[in-house]
Curated annotation (Swiss-Prot):
<feature type="transmembrane region" description="Helical">
    <location>
        <begin position="11"/>
        <end position="31"/>
    </location>
</feature>
<feature type="transmembrane region" description="Helical">
    <location>
        <begin position="34"/>
        <end position="54"/>
    </location>
</feature>
<dbReference type="GO" id="GO:0009414">
    <property type="term" value="P:response to water deprivation"/>
</dbReference>
<dbReference type="InterPro" id="IPR000612">
    <property type="entry name" value="PMP3"/>
</dbReference>
<comment type="similarity">
    <text>Belongs to the UPF0057 (PMP3) family.</text>
</comment>
<protein>
    <recommendedName>
        <fullName>Hydrophobic protein LTI6A</fullName>
    </recommendedName>
</protein>
<keyword id="KW-0812">Transmembrane</keyword>
<keyword id="KW-1133">Transmembrane helix</keyword>
<dbReference type="Pfam" id="PF01679">
    <property type="entry name" value="Pmp3"/>
</dbReference>
<dbReference type="GO" id="GO:0009737">
    <property type="term" value="P:response to abscisic acid"/>
</dbReference>
<keyword id="KW-0472">Membrane</keyword>
<dbReference type="GO" id="GO:0016020">
    <property type="term" value="C:membrane"/>
</dbReference>
<comment type="function">
    <text>Plays a role in the regulation of membrane potential. Could mediate a proton leak.</text>
</comment>
<dbReference type="GO" id="GO:0009409">
    <property type="term" value="P:response to cold"/>
</dbReference>
<dbReference type="GO" id="GO:0009651">
    <property type="term" value="P:response to salt stress"/>
</dbReference>
Length: 56
């Protein structure tokens, strides 16, 4: 139950601010930097990537 709750919160954060959700899940790794770059190019690609990375 707690793991699914954490994933749900991470997904909500990923929708509001994609790099923040990825940062809380993976720290300052390559996933964060890719998400940050995609968010700068467009908000929607950042959201899609963040949700995909968090749920995989």
């Amino acid at each position: 139950m707690a793991d699914s709750t954490a994933t749900c919160i991470d997904i909500i954060l990923a929708i509001i601010l994609p790099p923040l959700g990825v940062f809380f899940k993976f720290g300052c790794g390559i996933e964060f930097w890719i998400c940050l770059l995609l968010t700068f190019f467009g908000y929607l690609p950042g959201i899609i990537y963040a949700v995909w990375v968090i749920t995989k």
